[in-house]
Amino acid sequence: MSQVKRTPLYETHRALGAKMIPFGGWDMPVQYSGIIAEHNATREAAGLFDVSHMGEIFITGEPKIVLDFLELVTCNSVASLSDFQVQYNAILNENGGLVDDVTIYKFSVEKYMICSNASNYETVTAHLLKYLPASGVKVSDQSPNWHQIALQGPKANEIFSKFLGRELDSIKYYHFALLDYQGEEIIVSRTGYTGEDGFEIYSSIPFGLKLWSGLSELGKPQGLLPCGLGARDTLRIEAKYPLYGHELNNQWTPIESGIGWIVKEKKNPYFSSGKILSQKKNGTEFKIVAFALTEAGVPRENFRVLDFQGNEIGKTTSGTFSPSLKKGIGLASIRTEKIKDGEPIQIEIREQPKQAIITTKPFIPGSIRKN
């Protein structure tokens, strides 16, 4: 059995009284003061998350060869990216399933960075190396050299701007900047996984520790709290964001996973592009949708979804009690013909059918500043 890894902030989490759990091969904080308090702090003020377990994989080389390589293994259009733009994308396997969902950072025509999930970045690196051209492209997993934290919430911009001593409004949603702070170059990305405005900040490990401490102290009067994986999960479900291993896996295509909006037609074919584009046009048997309970109950993963005749039409993939809505919500893979906004369904919780409705609208408005 491989040894559980610890982030550079492990001792800080212990000192803060965090409850630690294994996640994706890492020992991570699930909560500090409490999931609901941390969730609400992020929605109303700011939350600080240790995400240094994520992977950073750099792709460099000759511009055309690099671009062609990235276009082959992904479904979104990397060619559409401008310098210093970020893109949500998926690394595909040969059958159109997801090796991982990722964000791709374009520094220049010669340099890109892929941010991958903690449990997958070694798999992603191996997959990329498997299909690497004979020359012209280099793939480098630099995850051990980077520290990443996320500052999220409606007050994130105010807090981080004050910390840096400069405005950050020029960094638009899903864009990033290379900033110099006291001689340290950091990557500041206006992205996140909460449905709120905020930043994901990449730096050296020593600076990352200072950044966590400085932001914690500066943000505390504003209501900032350190947040664990528990709040990260409730926040992302409210935002209808998928999680690998739940809504996403190596069998389901992007269409079946509910992220069909990132599937694009490209100049050249990519892995299973014929199959995936056909699904986008003609539909699939199952698809990920969101639902909300209309009576008391807390849904979890792998609960049966029923129609009102009692027929099984799918399974839940994620579920939680929503601190913002104060009711049970979740995501599920269900038969496509049953997907309609407001359609009544049932979620079987402890062998008891609980009434729910499908919702295609956002659960929460959030504070994201779209460009």
Curated annotation (Swiss-Prot):
State if Transferase is listed as a keyword: yes
For this record, the Gene Ontology CC terms, alphabetical, are:
cytosol; glycine cleavage complex
Reactions performed catalytically = N(6)-[(R)-S(8)-aminomethyldihydrolipoyl]-L-lysyl-[protein] + (6S)-5,6,7,8-tetrahydrofolate = N(6)-[(R)-dihydrolipoyl]-L-lysyl-[protein] + (6R)-5,10-methylene-5,6,7,8-tetrahydrofolate + NH4(+)
InterPro entries recorded for this chain? Answer: GCS_T (IPR006223), GCS_T_bac (IPR022903), GCST_C (IPR013977), GCV_T_N (IPR006222), GcvT/YgfZ/DmdA (IPR028896), GcvT/YgfZ_C (IPR029043), TrmE/GcvT_dom1 (IPR027266)
EC number(s) per entry: 2.1.2.10
Q: Which PANTHER family does UniProt cross-reference here?
A: AMINOMETHYLTRANSFERASE, AMINOMETHYLTRANSFERASE, MITOCHONDRIAL
> Any idea what this protein is called?
Aminomethyltransferase
